[in-house]
Amino acid sequence: MGGGFEKGGNVATFAEVAVDRKSGEVKVARLVTAFECGAIVNPDGLRNQLEGANIMALGGALFEAIEFANGQILNGRFSDYRLPRFSDVPVLETVMIDRKDIPSAGAGESSLVGVAPAIANAIFDATGVRLRSLPLVPNGLKVA
């Protein structure tokens, strides 16, 4: 049996949000992701993978939640489960750091790990409200 190894990527994410203090609506205006995974073999594929992961993470960060009552799932259909819509997708900026000096590594959905913390920190910066559980604003943000 051969030996295993792991080489992952490095990611940093920045979020810019707009908060309507009257309605409590939070809108992510921009997501910037910088990603390094060694030598980039397929730049278009990598960009698509990163942008898709960021949109997926946007839903989990803001409003995706399974609702329960008495041990039963209340929103078991996609018509009752809030997913990101085209109108939710912010401006996406992707910075791919191509390191020809090191071997390629897998990307997968690695970029999704930074999205929720970046959005939570942007909401805190805008409002002073620190949110610590996901989804961050399933029913709007309560701001004094």
Question: What function would you assign to each model-found segment?
Answer:
Residues 2-144:
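C-terminal catalytic domains of large/alpha subunits in multi-subunit enzymes
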